[in-house]
């Protein structure tokens, strides 16, 4: 259930600060959001896949922690990221 390299490269280009930026908070949140959206589509078809659902909940928790960190450290970057990804908060 991973993302293709093309999708990852597009996310890195859109949210990265420089060309090789893979670890900034914005990139991590954007990658997690793409994986979460991919898994949500998977669960519409495979309702009883509880093993993957546990992984989804871990990703949501990780994204929540990263967005809380970003909100605590830099509110402007946080609001820009939330608007760009279309997340609630």
From Swiss-Prot:
* The name this protein goes by in its record: Small ribosomal subunit protein uS15
Protein's GO biological process: translation
Q: Does the keyword Ribonucleoprotein apply?
A: yes
Q: Which residues form the signal peptide?
A: none
Question: Which SUPFAM superfamilies does the entry link to?
Answer: S15/NS1 RNA-binding domain (SSF47060)
Family note:
Belongs to the universal ribosomal protein uS15 family.
Q: What does this protein do?
A: One of the primary rRNA binding proteins, it binds directly to 16S rRNA where it helps nucleate assembly of the platform of the 30S subunit by binding and bridging several RNA helices of the 16S rRNA.
Question: What is known about its subunit structure?
Answer: Part of the 30S ribosomal subunit. Forms a bridge to the 50S subunit in the 70S ribosome, contacting the 23S rRNA.
Q: Please name the source species.
A: Shewanella baltica (strain OS155 / ATCC BAA-1091)
Family annotation (Pfam families): Ribosomal_S15
- Keyword Thylakoid present in the record's keywords: the answer is no
Q: Which GO cellular component terms, listed alphabetically, does the Swiss-Prot or TrEMBL entry include?
A: cytosolic small ribosomal subunit
| Gene behind this protein | rpsO
Q: Output the CDD domains linked to this UniProt entry.
A: Ribosomal_S15p_S13e
Stored Gene3D superfamilies? 6.10.250.3130, S15/NS1, RNA-binding (1.10.287.10)
Q: List, alphabetically, the InterPro entries matched.
A: Ribosomal_uS15, Ribosomal_uS15_bac-type, uS15_NS1_RNA-bd_sf
């Amino acid at each position: 259930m991973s993302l293709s390299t093309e999708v990852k490269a597009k996310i890195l280009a859109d949210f990265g600060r420089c060309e090789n930026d893979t670890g900034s908070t914005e990139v991590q949140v954007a990658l997690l959001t793409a994986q979460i959206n991919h898994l949500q589509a998977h669960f519409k078809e495979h309702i009883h896949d509880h093993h993957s659902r546990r992984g989804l909940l871990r990703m949501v928790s990780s994204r929540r922690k990263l967005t809380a960190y970003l909100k605590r450290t830099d509110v402007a970057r946080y609001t820009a990221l939330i608007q760009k990804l279309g997340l609630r908060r």
